[in-house]
C-alpha cells in the first residue's frame, strides 16, 4: 500500500513553528517511503477562517519547500460528501438525531461536574423512534457502549481508551454543518491517508475518529502524535518568546534550510549529527525515533545553523533570498556589485540575511557619516600621507583585481615605512565609513575604482576639516 500523509491546518492564523514541524515530519515520512503528501485546509470553522490565513499557510509551506503532491483540498467544498455519509449512517443506524436542547445539555453537564463526573451526553435520544417534528436537532454518532479503542502510536507507544469514557459525538450541528472530528474521518478515508502525524493535543480525538472509521468500514491509518514545543522558560511557545510564525523567521533573515534543519532536530535525532541536508533528512527520518518529551525552542541554536547555511550554501542561491531583504531595506541592487559577490564577501560574519543586507549597504550607496569611533581613531592627520599615496597608486593602476589591489596597499606601507594596518585601517574607514569590512582588496574591487577614489577624497576632506578645527 502506498504511504500517504497529510498536513491539515485550520486557516485561523499564520503557520506557526509547531504546525511547520508537524508538516515537516509528515512530509519527510511520505518522502522517505516513496509516498505522497497531501495538503488539506480544514476550514469548517467558517466564522474564524480567513483567506488571508490560507494564503499565509500556503506561503509558509512554499517558502520551506514543503511541496504537496495533492491539494490543497478545502473542507467547505466537500459538504455534499459529508452529508451523503451522514445520511448513510442514519440509514445504517450508526448515527441518530438528537433533539435535546442546549439548556438540557448544559444542565446535564453542570450536574455531572457537581457530582465529580466527567461531563458527557447521556444518550437520551439514542433509542428514540423517528420523530415527526420540526424541532431543531443535531446528529450524533452512536459510539460503542462496551470495549475499548486501542492503537499503537509511533511516538507514544500503545494507547487505550475505554468506550465508557466517550460519549455520542455530535457529527452535524443544528444548522446542518458537519463537525471537525467527522470531517477529518471522511477526508482521511476518501484521500487514502495511511499515516496521521499531528500534535499531541489531538490524542483525545483519535479514539472517537477510529470508532467512526470502524462504523464506516473504512481502513484505519497509523498515528503519530508529536509533543508540543516549549519556550526557553518551559512554557508553551508563544509570541512573547519571539518569532513563532514561519514567515516571521523569513522576515528576520533566516534561510528555509536553517529553519527546516532546526525543526527536524526539535524532537528527532540521528546519533549526534546536527547538520542535515534535505536528502539526508529523507534518508534517515523515522517516526519511531521522535522523542515523546516536549522540546524547548533555542534561538541561539537556530542562529548557529543559519550562519552555517549562509556560509556553506551556493552564494547564487543565498543571493536569491537576500534580494528580498535588500528590497525590504530599500537598497538599490542595480547600483553596485552582483549579489552573489556580496554574499561571497560578507557571508563569513553574517548570522542572518537582514544583517547581511544591512552591512552591504556601503557597496550600493554612499554612507551618510563616518562611524565616529572609527573616524576618531583612524582618520587622523597622521593618516593623510597614507591615503594620498594609496589614492595615487589606485588612480594610476589599470589592474583592479584582488592581487593587484593587495599589492598596492602593501607597496604603500613599504614606501612609507609603516605597518599594513597604518594604511589599511584609514583606507577601510575611508572606503566603507566604518572599521569593519571584508578584506580590503575584495572591498575595493567590489566598490569599484571611481567610487573608491571619491571616498578617499571625502576622507581627506574630513581630515583637513579636523586639522582646521584643532
Curated annotation (Swiss-Prot):
InterPro entries hit by this protein: aa-tRNA-synth_I_cd-bd, aa-tRNA-synth_I_codon-bd_sub2, aa-tRNA-synth_I_CS, aa_tRNA-synth_I_cd-bd_sf, Glu-tRNA-ligase_bac/mito, Glu/Gln-tRNA-synth, Glu/Gln-tRNA-synth_Ib_cat-dom, GluQ/Sye
Cellular component, GO, one term: cytosol
UniProt keyword terms in alphabetical order: Aminoacyl-tRNA synthetase, ATP-binding, Cytoplasm, Ligase, Nucleotide-binding, Protein biosynthesis
Keyword Protein biosynthesis (UniProt): yes
SUPFAM superfamilies associated with the record: An anticodon-binding domain of class I aminoacyl-tRNA synthetases, Nucleotidylyl transferase
PROSITE patterns the UniProt entry points to: AA_TRNA_LIGASE_I (PS00178)
UniProt motif ('HIGH' region) ranges: 9-19
HAMAP family linked to this entry: Glu_tRNA_synth_type1
Function: Catalyzes the attachment of glutamate to tRNA(Glu) in a two-step reaction: glutamate is first activated by ATP to form Glu-AMP and then transferred to the acceptor end of tRNA(Glu).
Protein name as catalogued: Glutamate--tRNA ligase
Taxonomic source organism: Psychromonas ingrahamii (strain DSM 17664 / CCUG 51855 / 37)
